[in-house]
């Protein structure tokens, strides 16, 4: 995995390189004439709302890193349950800002954010815990991954809204694979009375291909790499895995008990 695992410092340069590329693509698409109020692959969000969302979250990250560096107290985490609604409201709150002005603000924020991430030391990458507005304290490397999620997936959203055939970047997908298990663990909502079960997840190709055993119980979801020969398996390529985890498509291949697969795939709420 090495340089393709953003959770380790060895993956930092690769992750930031891909984030830069996706951010440039995102703003190049968003600044085109005639697209500002166009629909996107993110339900009820227009292109301008995606830009507003990036401005909103990135500027909040600056405050959060300042708090982490200064040992300052912040309010308790909002929680991920209300994240989709609040993020949508915040993104739409910038609708009165002209296209050129908001795109330039987004580019400026990104330049500042990438500089902040580039300056992180090996100790910072995994050891500096930064209080995320929705999720609470997380290692700093998650903020690089959040930038990739936003720029990578929302670039896909802009293209999806155009109605043209397209696909997710392989580099984006490969880097995000490990983080999708974290996303699933944060958004699983099993019924308290439901019987525990296991399922296998197979990523068929790319830098983070492999098999993962996922255990689901009343308290949530846990996962670990391991043999899945005895389990029902959901098989994905990297791109369809990321897009399925984000609720953008219904991807994957079931190998085994469809009822187990359906039960698993319907565990999650969207953020």
Residue ranges and their predicted role:
Residues 93-156, 160-161:
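Contiguous mid-protein beta-loop-alpha structural module that forms a pocket-lining wall or clamp
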């Amino acid at each position: 995995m090495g340089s393709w695992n953003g959770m380790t410092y060895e993956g930092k340069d690769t992750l930031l390189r891909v984030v830069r590329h996706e951010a440039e693509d995102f703003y190049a698409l968003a600044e085109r004439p005639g697209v500002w109020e166009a629909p996107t692959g993110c339900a009820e969000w227009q292109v301008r709302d995606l830009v507003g969302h990036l401005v909103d979250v990135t500027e909040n990250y600056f405050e959060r890193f300042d708090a982490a560096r200064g040992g300052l107290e912040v309010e308790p985490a909002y929680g991920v349950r209300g994240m989709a609604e609040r993020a949508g409201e915040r993104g739409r709150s910038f609708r009165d800002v002209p296209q050129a002005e908001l795109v330039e603000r987004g580019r400026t924020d990104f330049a500042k954010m990438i500089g902040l991430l580039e300056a992180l030391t090996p100790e910072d990458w995994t050891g500096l815990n930064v209080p995320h507005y929705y999720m609470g304290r997380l290692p700093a490397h998650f903020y690089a991954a959040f930038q990739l999620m936003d720029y990578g997936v929302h670039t896909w959203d802009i293209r999806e809204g155009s109605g043209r055939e397209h696909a997710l970047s392989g580099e984006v997908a490969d880097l995000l694979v490990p983080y999708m298990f974290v996303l699933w663990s944060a958004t699983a909502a099993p019924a308290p009375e439901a019987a525990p079960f296991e399922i296998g997840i197979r990523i068929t190709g790319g830098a983070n291909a492999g098999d993962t055993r996922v255990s689901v119980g009343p308290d949530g979801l846990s996962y670990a790499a391991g043999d899945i020969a005895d389990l029902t398996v959901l098989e994905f390529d990297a791109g369809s895995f990321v897009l399925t985890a984000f609720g953008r498509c219904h991807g994957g291949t079931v190998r085994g008990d469809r009822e187990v697969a359906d039960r698993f795939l319907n565990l999650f709420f969207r953020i």
